[in-house]
Amino acid sequence: MGYEAGQYDVIVIGAGHAGVEAALASARQGAKTLVLTINLDMVAFMPCNPSVGGPAKGIVVREIDALGGEMARNIDKTHIQMRMLNTGKGPAVRALRAQADKFQYQHEMKHTLEKTPNLTLLQGIAERLIIEDGECRGVITQTGAEYKAKTVVLTTGTYLRGRIILGDLSYSSGPNNQQPSIKLSEHLEELGFDLVRFKTGTPPRVSSDSIDYSKTEIQPGDPVPRAFSYETVEYITDQLPCWLTYTSPETHEIIDSNLHRSPMYSGMIKGTGPRYCPSIEDKVVRFNDKPRHQIFLEPEGRNTQEVYVQGLSTSLPEDVQQRMLATIPGLEKVQMMRAGYAIEYDAIVPTQLWPTLETKKIPNLYTAGQINGTSGYEEAAGQGIMAGINAGRKALGKEEVILSRSDAYIGVLIDDLVTKGTNEPYRLLTSRAEYRLLLRHDNADLRLTEIGHDIGLISDERYEAFEKKKAAIEAEKKRLWSVIIKPSPENQEYIRSLGGSELKDGVRGTDLMKRPEMNYETVTKLAPADSPVPQDVAEQVEIQVKYEGYIEKSLQQVEKLKKMENKKIPDRIDYDAIKGIATEARQKLKEVRPLSVAQASRISGVNPADISILLVYLEQGRIAKVAE
C-alpha cells in the first residue's frame, strides 16, 4: 500500500556529482528540496578516477563556481595535489586539474548538503514517477512512500539497469557493487522515453606498500598555490605526488593472448563505450604499433593504501589483470586490492530534452548527468547545477535560464546534447567550443557571476568583490593605455635584454604589451602602478590586452550568432507544412524541435539550404498552421 510521505518544491533523485549540484542550486534559491538516493554513504562518490578538472573539464568546474555551485570549493578543501595544465600554450586551453582525496571529498560534500537550509536528505530507492495530467508531480519509492513535488530531477548516473562485467562474470549492480535501479529504468520506457545502452570502465586499484616507486617517475603538484574557486583563500600546501610508469611489450602480449576472454571482444558487452577513455585492451588492439602506454599511479586519498592505476581501465578476468600488472615497471610484486571492471547502464536519448534540461515528453521532469549520455564528474556537475537552477525556478514560478555556447562550456555541453544527441558517452573537449578564446579558465567569473547573482546563488558580498575586481581591471587597462613609455637609454636597454627591438618613439603601455616578448610584468617594470595590483587583475589585463584583436573577432562572431539565436521558432510549428525542406532535415527538426534558427542550424542532417527555406517562411510569416 502506498502512503503520502511529504510535499516538496523539488525532488532530486540521486546524489552523485549531478545530484548534489542540482539539490544545492534548488535549495539555495529557496525551493524546499528533497534528495532521494540509494545509499547516503555514497554522496558525491568517485567510482572511477580520483580527480577533478583537466582540459575543458577544469573550466566547467570554474563555471560551476562562478554560478554559485559547490564542486570547486569542495575540491579546494579536499585535494591531495593540484596542477595547471598546458601552461606553455595559450590561455584558451589552460586548465587546472586536481587529484582528490576521494573519501574526504564525499564526506565534505555530504556535510555541505546536511547543513544547507531547505534541503532534506533521504535514503531510498525511487521506482516510479507520479504522473498527473501528463506532468510529473512526484516520485514513489520501493516502500510505497509517495513524495509530491512541483518538479523532479533525475540524476541516476550509471545505476539505471546497471550491470557489472568482469571477465565471464556478469551481474546486476551499480558502480562499486552498489544496488542498481531496475524498476525506474523500466518505468521510463513505459512512459515512452527512448533509452540507449552505454558502457564505461574502471582500472584496478593496488596497494601503495607493494609498489616499487624507484622504477617510476615522480609527478609532483605545482609549487605555486592553486584553487578552482574564486572564493578560496586558504591553500593546501602538503601535496602528495603521483607517479608515472608504462606498460611493456610483455603487458601487450598478455592482453593479446587473452582477448578471447575479454567481454569487449567476446560480445558480452553490448553497450557503447567512451571514445576518449578506451580500455587497455582497446588501446593495445587499436594502437598495436606503440611499444608502450602511459600509466599514472594516483593515490586515492591521504588515509588509504589504495592507488588508482590510471590508463589501465579493463574488464579482463581477475587473473589476467594480476599477470598484466606484474609486467609494468614498479608493479612487479604489486598487490591488487580491487579488480577493474566494466559497467553497462541505461541513458536517455538527450534530444528528448529542452535546453533547460526539462524533458519534452513529461513537463516538470528534468534530467542531468550520465543519464543524459555524458561521461565525467565535471560534465555531470555542470548539467546538475543547470537542472537544479531551472527545476527550482520553475517550482518557484520564475523564468528558466539557458546558457548559450558563447556563455560557457556548460552551454556548449548542453546544446550539443539536446541538439545533436550522442551515440557514445559524451566527453567535453576544448575543440567542441567555437569561442574557446572567450571561454577561458581565467574569466569564468567575468562571464557568469552576474548570472549567478541574479539567480540568487551568489551572495551580495561576493558580488561586490567581483564588481571591484572588474573595476580594477578596467582602471589598470586605462592606466596602461594612457601611460607613454619613452625611448630612454634605460628603457631601451631593458627591452633589448628581453630580446625586443628598440623603441623609435614613445609608445603606449598597452601597445608595448602586445609585443611577443613583453607581458604585464615586464611592461609594469617600465610603467609601475602606484599601488600593488592583485595577481588575478594583472592576469586579466595581460590577456585582454595581448589578445585584444582575436577576442574582438570572436565577439563579432558571437554577435552574428545572437542574431540567429534571436530568430525564434514557434514551439508548435508544423514542419510538414514547409515545402522544400529535405526529408532527413524535416525528421530531425520534428525530433529536436529547436527553439531558434541558430539551434536548428546545428542539427546534424539539417543543411544551409533547409535553413534558408525555414528563414523565408519565418520572415514572411507564412507558417500559420501548427502541429496539433
UniProtKB/Swiss-Prot annotation:
Homodimer. Heterotetramer of two MnmE and two MnmG subunits. GO terms for cellular component: cytosol. SMART domains: GIDA_assoc_3 (SM01228). It comes from Bacillus velezensis (strain DSM 23117 / BGSC 10A6 / LMG 26770 / FZB42) (Bacillus amyloliquefaciens subsp. plantarum). This is tRNA uridine 5-carboxymethylaminomethyl modification enzyme MnmG. It comes from the Bacteria. Disulfide bonds: none annotated. The keyword tRNA processing applies.
